[in-house]
Amino acid sequence: MIKCNVTTCGVITSSAEEKTSKEGEKFISFSMMVPFEGKDGTVKEQYISVSAPGNAQSAANYSAGRRVTVSGVLYIRKHDNNTYLNLRTDANIEINDSTTPDRLVGSMEFRGKISKKGVKDFNSKKGKPMQSFSAFSSDKNVENYEFTWVSFINLSPIHEEYLAADKYVEVHGDLQLDVFKGELQLECKVNSVAPWELNKTAGANAEQQPS
């Protein structure tokens, strides 16, 4: 599971439409695009699906081409080897001027499994101890599992048994996004790490391994 509390600003690419949930409640849905430039100079135009309380009348305010700022809960998952970002908000959606900069900032809550490479200890250029590790979250799509990887940087090294290769962890930290060769890279600056105690359902999913 990868869940983030974020604020993002971008351009609406498909006008809002009224929809009805399984519970019969009306809401609006639209897509927006936020561009990200990576350290390697490549750019990724990332599309985000947004859902918010509303109806056909309020949907008319959010037409394609308008720049908006949305705050809410962002869910990140893989499907058909593509990374999808779905943002749910209960807050007011702010309509912005064209000069308002693109952005996506916030915090991340991650539950998943540390890679077989484990945790690397190293020193920064200023000699400060740090750690880095990668971990994945798995999602089941029909009969197949897909894996979303996150790269973590920990500025306060932890040397506990639960922070090691093939261990399940729950991580909270600052969401950071990068682009490498035109593909979105998920990163997180760690604030806290704890062992993730799996229930039977989560355990069955988490036992799946990327090939």
Roles of regions detected by a PLM:
Residues 66, 83-85, 106, 131:
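Generic beta-strand structural signal
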Residues 65-79, 167-180:
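Flexible glycine-rich surface loops and low-complexity tracts that mediate binding to linear polymers
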Residues 71-100:
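Short, structured interface segments
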Residues 49-51:
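Intrinsically disordered, low-complexity regulatory segments
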